[in-house]
Amino acid sequence: MKKIAIIGAGVIGSAVAYELAQRGWRTCNIDKLPAAGYGSTSNSCAIVRFSYSTYQGVAMSYEGMHYWTDWENYLGGPEIDESGLIEFRQTGTALIKAPDGHHQKVTPLLEELSIPHEHWDLNRLSERLPILDHGVLGPPSRPEDESFWADSTDDIEGALFTPESGYVSDPQLSSHNLQRAAEAC
């Protein structure tokens, strides 16, 4: 049997351990903290979004969403972890169409990968997220600068909504789920 040491026991280290364990490797995660998912990046799996600026980032995040939506089957069943399994809550996310134009980089990638998305104007954004302030604030300034207190004079353009995105109910538990699944292999 092949053996490997994995540095880190967060969601990435635990996922690597699980994937390798399924392939017959004996894994050992090394982490300075007391349990899986306790590190500074434990929440890095919390929000599942597709608004990255590279093809690879968007493609990987969209593929990853499919693991979250089928988490129980991916891990081998509900009994894999005595603490229970996380839930993926598919709420969708809204990327604000801000002056920096990030949405213009993301839109062609979503289209190329056939990822469902919607362009919301300010009316639609107000219907869906009525509490959201549409004002553009910035550029950044210090509190002692007079412009720091100025009201916004411009509005955002709207939002780019991706209905299949969402969040993981308990990021720390997701690492624990992966740890238990790796141990069960």
Kindly give the residue locations of the regions a language model identified.
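Beta1/beta-strand and adjacent pyrophosphate-binding region of the FAD-binding site
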Residues: 1-12, 28
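Glycine-rich FAD pyrophosphate-binding loop
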Residues: 21-41
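Gly/Ala-rich phosphate-binding loop of Rossmann-like dinucleotide-binding domains
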Residues: 17, 21, 181
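Conserved dinucleotide-binding and phosphotransfer motif residues
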Residues: 23, 113, 184-185
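Short beta-to-alpha linker loops that shape the active-site pocket of alpha/beta-hydrolase fold enzymes
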Residues: 33-35, 125, 178
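Helical element adjacent to the flavin cofactor pocket in flavoenzyme catalytic cores
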Residues: 147-185
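Short, flexible, mixed-charge acidic loops at enzyme active sites
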Residues: 39-45, 149-153
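Dinucleotide-binding Rossmann-like beta1-alpha1 core, especially the glycine-rich loop
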Residues: 45-146
